[in-house]
UniProtKB/Swiss-Prot annotation:
This is Carboxy-S-adenosyl-L-methionine synthase. It holds the Pfam family Methyltransf_25. It is an enzyme of class 2 (transferase). It comes from Campylobacter jejuni subsp. jejuni serotype O:2 (strain ATCC 700819 / NCTC 11168). Transmembrane segments: none annotated. Catalyzes the conversion of S-adenosyl-L-methionine (SAM) to carboxy-S-adenosyl-L-methionine (Cx-SAM). Its EC number is 2.1.3.-. Gene3D superfamilies: Vaccinia Virus protein VP39. Homodimer. S-adenosyl-L-methionine binds at Y35, G60, C61, S62, D83, N84, N124, R191. GO terms for molecular function: carboxyl- or carbamoyltransferase activity; S-adenosyl-L-methionine binding. Keywords: S-adenosyl-L-methionine, Transferase.
Length: 235
């Protein structure tokens, strides 16, 4: 379905409810620049470097796009998805079933999730929705539960520290969304709904959190304006 949720002024803060779940795939493909290309980059990289029967857990898996892509690349992967939205998980499970894929899903608040050890954790556009006081604790849990030589892939919307640059990057991002078919009204309405819900950090703040969690080797593997993907390795 086409995302037309913000053609009217929002009556509540943004949440991943049934209305969002029904249009999520269209929404994210039109709202996150190079979403599919970045998903495929990360998936192909993991498929290339991970050993047989590696375990991958997507934290904030939404509609399972990344897990489904991985499952079709490598049949040996053990795949898990966690999300706090029952509506999003309903979509994820339906898609996985339609493709005949064996993916285990868990409905849970990530800050209260009973973590298990994995070779890879993925947090694509997830941390930005976690309340700031809880983010470091969550990253600490991720690091703790990664197996030796484990990997974290983390994609985030980011802030620029320079106010002038930040203003112009935000305007360019709005231009991008207009080119994807969103009106100025829809863009403004969604921004209003996301205020104090999606709270981005700067690149430096994200790197500091990763380092504090214990990661020593951290690289940026994708960036477009105010979107960036980091890969971090556990020793």
């Amino acid at each position: 379905m086409k995302d037309e949720l913000f053609k009217q002024s929002p009556k509540k803060q943004f949440e991943f409810d049934k209305s969002v779940a029904s249009v999520f795939d269209d929404m994210i493909n039109r709202s996150v620049p190079f979403y599919r290309e970045n998903l495929e980059l990360c998936g192909n990289l993991l498929a290339k470097i991970l050993p047989t029967n590696a375990s991958v857990c997507d934290l904030g898996c939404s509609s399972a796009n990344f897990l489904i892509f991985l499952a079709n690349l490598r049949k040996d992967f053990k795949l898990f998805g966690v999300d706090n939205s029952a509506s999003m998980l309903e979509v994820a499970k339906s898609k996985a079933k339609a493709y005949g894929l064996d993916i285990s899903f868990f409905e849970a608040n990530l800050c209260e999730f009973d973590f298990f050890t994995c070779d890879v954790f993925v947090a694509n556009y997830t941390m930005q929705f976690i309340r700031p006081p809880k983010r470091q604790e969550l990253l600490d849990q991720i690091y703790k539960n990664l197996n030796s030589k484990g990997i974290l892939i983390m994609s985030e919307k980011i802030l620029y520290e320079d106010a002038f640059l930040s203003k112009n990057i935000i305007e360019l991002y709005a231009d991008y969304k207009e080119k994807q078919g969103y009106s100025k009204f829809e863009i403004a309405a969604k921004r209003e709904a996301l205020e104090n819900v999606l709270i981005p950090y700067s690149q430096k703040e994200n790197l500091n959190m990763l380092e504090k969690a214990g990661f020593k080797k951290i690289e940026s593997i994708f960036k477009w304006a105010n979107f960036e993907t980091f890969i971090a390795f556990k020793d």
